[in-house]
């Protein structure tokens, strides 16, 4: 009876590990428009109705500043040519185009990120899922040689480890949802930094914003890498001869996974040099 209970706990635990890989891949691979249509429409409405008018004011200021700078830097108005005005009109057209197509640009960035995550999910899910039946069969041989006391201790261990995995799953869900909320907040204010990109001095605001956007998009890939490493390590530890050691390794790797997921955001920003 104890062996049957332990096998049931192990089956549930390994099933959770396999499902977690697929669940995280599905969550991380979502774009802002696909994750929650209602939230996306609200954010888009706020951006277009509240932020875009402010971005228009910023464009006006930036373009006026740009025109004054272009004129005054030419020897106090004595050395001027008509070409600078064509250049200014081109900058103005580009700036207006970028602001009016901000959401297309932002969604394109996350479409790239989604494509990368989807490709990674296929590789990770195919190579890192645990063969539950084979693993349980291998463990059954070791459990049949254990006494009642050791089996009772092992059953408690499996119960605790299974509970630990469920808690970690909740924390991972919090991380994933927190990332999506951060994405929505970042997207909502997109027109303002984009409006500064036509100016040499102010353009760093928009450039840094795009870096942060790419960091958020590719954070999903880093999350998939962490999950893939976790699943492969778990798969290797499960087949260990010492069942107790294998179970505690599962717990240790789960804690490491959760810590690694918390670090993916700062790592992605560091890679893209986003402040």
In which residue ranges do the predicted regions lie?
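Binding/recognition "hotspot" determinant
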Residues: 1-58
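Alpha-helical transmembrane segments and their helix-start/interface "positive-inside/aromatic belt" motifs
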Residues: 1-6, 80-98, 102, 206-215
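Alpha-helical membrane-interface segments at transmembrane helix boundaries
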Residues: 43-52, 83, 87-90, 144, ...
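Juxtamembrane "helix exit" motif at the C-terminal ends of alpha-helical transmembrane segments
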Residues: 56, 60-72, 223-238
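Hydrophobic transmembrane alpha-helix segments characteristic of membrane transport
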Residues: 58-94, 189-203
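Non-cytosolic segments of integral membrane proteins
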Residues: 93-189, 223, 227-272
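Alpha-helical transmembrane segments
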Residues: 194-211, 239-240, 270-273
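Alpha-helical transmembrane segments of multi-pass membrane proteins
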Residues: 212-224
């Amino acid at each position: 009876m104890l062996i049957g209970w332990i096998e049931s706990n192990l089956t549930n635990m390994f099933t959770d590990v396999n499902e977690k890989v697929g669940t995280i891949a599905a969550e991380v691979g979502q774009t802002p428009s696909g994750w929650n249509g209602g939230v996306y429409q609200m954010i888009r409405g706020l951006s277009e109705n509240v932020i875009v008018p402010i971005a228009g004011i910023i464009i006006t200021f930036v373009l006026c500043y740009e025109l004054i700078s272009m004129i005054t830097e030419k020897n106090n108005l004595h050395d001027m040519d008509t070409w600078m005005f064509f250049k200014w009109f081109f900058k103005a057209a580009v700036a207006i185009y970028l602001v009016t197509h901000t959401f297309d640009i932002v969604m394109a960035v996350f479409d790239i990120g989604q494509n990368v995550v989807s490709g990674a999910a296929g590789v990770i899910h195919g190579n890192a899922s645990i063969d539950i039946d084979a693993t349980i069969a291998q463990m059954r041989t070791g459990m049949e040689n254990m006494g009642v006391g050791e089996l009772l201790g092992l059953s408690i261990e499996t119960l605790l480890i299974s509970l630990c995995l469920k808690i970690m799953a909740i924390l991972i869900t919090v991380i994933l949802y927190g990332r999506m909320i951060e994405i929505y907040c970042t997207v909502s204010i997109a027109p303002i930094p984009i409006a500064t990109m036509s100016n040499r001095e102010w353009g760093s605001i928009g450039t840094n914003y795009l870096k942060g956007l790419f960091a958020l998009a590719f954070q999903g890939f880093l999350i998939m890498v962490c999950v893939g490493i976790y699943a492969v390590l778990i798969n290797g530890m499960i087949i260990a001869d010492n069942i107790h050691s294998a179970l505690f390794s599962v717990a240790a790797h789960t804690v490491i996974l959760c810590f690694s997921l918390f670090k993916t955001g700062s790592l992605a920003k560091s890679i893209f040099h986003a402040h």
